[in-house]
């Protein structure tokens, strides 16, 4: 497992930190956790291709955690992405999906699935389990855990 912190700042940018975004490279996949507005630039600095991202997990809908998502999706489309992308988030993700599509310039030529989730196991493969848990914040907020399954 390789974890890259793209941003760890709060809602206000600073000279040295960017809005939240974390990349997990594991199990032959690249997963993004939160997508602050500087995510694309930070991916370039980290030499991580956004085209390799297979899943995006959003913790909550404050702007510093999600405002990079519309631009990232548009850039993936401009770059000719074809493979599906799955986006997970707490209740309210369908409103985010509708907002992205209503921006006027958004038409995507690759499949995007928006999945609203709550606490519990949200994804299980032969190699790993991803769980979410609601945590204290002033809005619905999910924390995520990734558990690697034991190999026989």
Positions of PLM-derived features:
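Binuclear metal-dependent hydrolase catalytic cores
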Residues: 1-152
């Amino acid at each position: 497992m390789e974890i890259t912190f793209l941003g760890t700042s709060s809602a206000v940018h600073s000279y040295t930190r960017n809005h939240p975004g974390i990349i997990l490279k594991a199990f032959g996949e690249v997963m993004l956790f939160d997508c602050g507005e500087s995510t694309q630039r930070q991916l370039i600095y980290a030499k991580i291709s956004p085209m390799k991202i297979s899943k995006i997990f959003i913790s909550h809908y404050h702007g510093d955690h999600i405002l990079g998502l519309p631009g990232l999706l548009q850039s993936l489309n401009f770059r000719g992405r074809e493979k599906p992308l799955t986006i997970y988030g707490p209740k309210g993700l369908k409103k985010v999906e509708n907002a992205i599509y209503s921006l006027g310039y958004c038409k995507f030529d690759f499949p995007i699935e928006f999945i609203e989730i709550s606490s519990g196991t949200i994804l299980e493969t032969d190699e790993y389990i991803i769980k979410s848990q609601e945590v204290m914040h002033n809005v619905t907020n999910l924390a995520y855990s990734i558990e690697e399954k034991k190999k026989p």
